[in-house]
């Protein structure tokens, strides 16, 4: 049964916190169909939320205490023994007889003493524990007798109840541990259930195991180590906007853990330019996910709009537009160990863009797309933090999307495109935290001319830095970012982080076209506490296309406050 109260039994596992950096992912963004930086913010917000939740799984459910490799068994004492005729097992359904024989055969002899029998039972218990069945136990069916087989019964056990020590927590044990009741206790399933709960910022839970009231039964107690408010907010300001839309930007993100009591999560984000002019860029997005065992279903919706004046020789006209995006994704945990998460994801997206210039509709810059995407994501902690995603996207003609056969020219962007993308990030910290290095590589390739919504943005704060006015995006491209930081503690709450960065990029619009190279540099400092962070950077372009303005370098300021 599922319950919400229990006495605290003995603890079966320990956890340790791994210091990890939430690496911001580089994502493909649109071009003239909408403000590219607004689209970048919407995509990046969703991917950052997903990454932070995956990081919490590893931080809050770290590895078991390391165990030394078993040495050679000590010499057996001289004691009475039984002349047994082989070993007979009963009750083994979870581990094959061949595996059991391979483990126990070296311990068998014609004369089995009490010490040797105990070694055999211990080895059998360890074999089940290594396979994740931590509540299984073997015992002798009867007293050994000369001339008889050694009879061993394996009680593989079952989960009798799953109980919550804090009944006021708004979580669902049934959704976190589906199908576990009545089945043998499997450590991987237990850890996965805890992972699904601990991915929420406000929860930090652990599990204890106690004997049940029925023979072979086990009671699981889920209890909190710490807890926080389920509602959170992040307010931020930055001046990384463009001159033609507005320099100053503000953003607000609200999060709510388990609003329906189903271990779900919802985030609402909005951003807007703050300059009081006729130009603006605004975006709003909604992200929701709900887990069930090893699966997670996610929904997202976003809307962005922009407007800015364009000065012509004889008059000033207005460019404006909007983009709507909706997506449904299904994520499956494929593999997990103490420092690795491997996830597979399928996503179906609908994207609609409308662009106008001087009140005239721009059909080519207003694609309607339906996109299916499959990806694999690997998050691994070893000597540093590795985060990589490999994806394939295919444009479809579903749900009212544009059709390739309706294009006026084969050279125009394809709605039924093919696109491959790889993102690899590595973060490493020096001894005693004296330095940290963050390296990010993003690659995108498509054999087709891509719509603006699917092109890769190469010049941005999260791509090649130093290009505030000049936007470069293409169907094919690569970006390699590197940042070296020297964090220093100031007292007990403050951290000062000087840093320097160097980025390079390469782009090619279509196969056969001439490539374009980019390079930019960054030097800055960050000051942070637990709840807020201030970043000040000087960015400068080193190499790239002819600039649209005479801005050789610029200062970037960003302030964020977590409530």
Question: Would you name each region that the model predicts?
Answer:
Residues 34-241, 271-282, 441:
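Periplasmic polypeptide-binding modules associated with outer-membrane biogenesis and secretion
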Residues 267, 277-378:
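Transmembrane beta-barrel wall of Gram-negative outer-membrane proteins
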Residues 254, 523-532, 551-563:
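Outer-membrane beta-barrel "beta-signal"
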Residues 354-504, 508-510, 547-549, 557-562:
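C-terminal outer-membrane beta-barrel translocator/porin domains of Gram-negative envelope proteins
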Residues 205, 230-233, 260-266, 293-299, ...:
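Repeated loop/turn-to-beta-strand initiation elements of outer-membrane beta-barrel proteins
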Residues 209, 235-239, 266-272, 286, ...:
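Transmembrane beta-barrel strands of outer-membrane/channel proteins
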Residues 256-258, 290, 332-334, 376-380, ...:
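Residue-level signature of outer-membrane beta-barrel architecture
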Residues 200, 215, 243-247, 277-281, ...:
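Transmembrane beta-barrel outer-membrane domains
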């Amino acid at each position: 049964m599922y319950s919400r109260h229990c006495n605290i039994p003995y603890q079966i596992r320990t956890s340790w916190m791994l210091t990890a950096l939430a690496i911001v992912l580089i994502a493909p963004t649109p071009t003239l169909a909408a403000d590219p930086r607004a689209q970048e913010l919407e995509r990046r917000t969703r991917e950052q939320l997903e990454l932070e939740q995956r990081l919490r799984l590893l931080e809050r459910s770290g590895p078991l205490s390391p165990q030394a490799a078993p040495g050679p068994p000590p010499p057996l004492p001289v004691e009475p023994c039984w002349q047994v005729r082989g070993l007979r097992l009963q009750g083994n359904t979870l581990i094959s007889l061949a595996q059991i024989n391979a483990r126990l055969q070296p311990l068998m002899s014609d004369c089995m003493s009490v010490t040797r029998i105990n070694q055999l039972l211990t080895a059998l218990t360890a074999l089940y524990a290594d396979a994740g069945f931590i509540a299984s136990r073997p015992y002798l069916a009867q007293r050994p007798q000369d001339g008889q087989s050694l009879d061993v019964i394996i009680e593989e056990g079952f989960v009798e109840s799953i109980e919550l020590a804090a009944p006021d927590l708004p979580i669902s044990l049934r959704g976190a541990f589906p199908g576990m009741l009545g089945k043998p206790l499997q450590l991987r399933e237990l850890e996965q259930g805890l992972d699904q709960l601990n991915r929420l910022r406000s929860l930090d839970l652990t599990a204890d195991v106690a004997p049940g009231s029925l023979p072979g039964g086990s009671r699981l107690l889920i209890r909190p180590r710490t807890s926080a408010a389920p509602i959170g907010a992040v307010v931020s300001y930055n001046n990384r906007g463009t001159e033609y839309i507005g320099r100053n930007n503000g953003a607000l993100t609200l999060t709510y853990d388990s609003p329906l009591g189903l271990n779900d999560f919802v985030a609402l984000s909005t951003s807007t330019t703050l300059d009081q002019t006729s130009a603006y860029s605004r975006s709003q997005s909604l992200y929701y996910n709900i887990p069930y065992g090893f699966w997670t279903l996610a929904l997202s919706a976003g809307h962005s709009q922009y407007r800015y004046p364009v000065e012509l020789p004889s008059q000033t006209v207005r460019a404006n537009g909007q983009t709507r995006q909706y997506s449904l994704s299904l994520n499956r945990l494929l593999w997990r160990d103490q420092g690795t998460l491997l996830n597979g994801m399928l996503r179906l997206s609908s994207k609609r863009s409308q662009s106008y210039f001087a009140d005239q509709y721009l059909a080519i810059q207003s694609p309607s797309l339906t996109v299916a995407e499959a990806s694999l994501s690997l998050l691994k902690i070893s000597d540093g933090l590795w985060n990589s995603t490999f994806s394939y996207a295919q444009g479809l003609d579903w749900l009212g999307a544009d059709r390739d056969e309706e294009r006026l020219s084969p050279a125009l962007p394809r709605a039924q495109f093919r696109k491959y993308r790889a993102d690899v990030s590595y973060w490493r910290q020096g001894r005693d935290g004296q330095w940290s290095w963050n390296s990010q590589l993003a690659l995108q390739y498509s054999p087709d001319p891509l719509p603006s919504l699917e092109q890769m943005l190469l010049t941005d704060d999260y791509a090649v830095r130093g290009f505030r006015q000049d936007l470069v995006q293409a169907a094919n491209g690569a970006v390699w970012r590197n940042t070296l930081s020297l964090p220093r503690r100031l007292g007990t709450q403050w951290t000062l982080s000087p840093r320097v960065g160097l980025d390079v990029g390469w782009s090619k619009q279509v196969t056969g076209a001439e490539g374009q190279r980019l390079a930019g540099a960054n030097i800055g400092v960050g000051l942070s506490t637990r709840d807020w962070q201030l970043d000040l950077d000087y960015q400068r372009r080193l190499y790239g296309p002819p600039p649209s303005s005479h801005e050789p370098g610029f200062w970037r300021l960003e302030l964020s406050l977590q409530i």
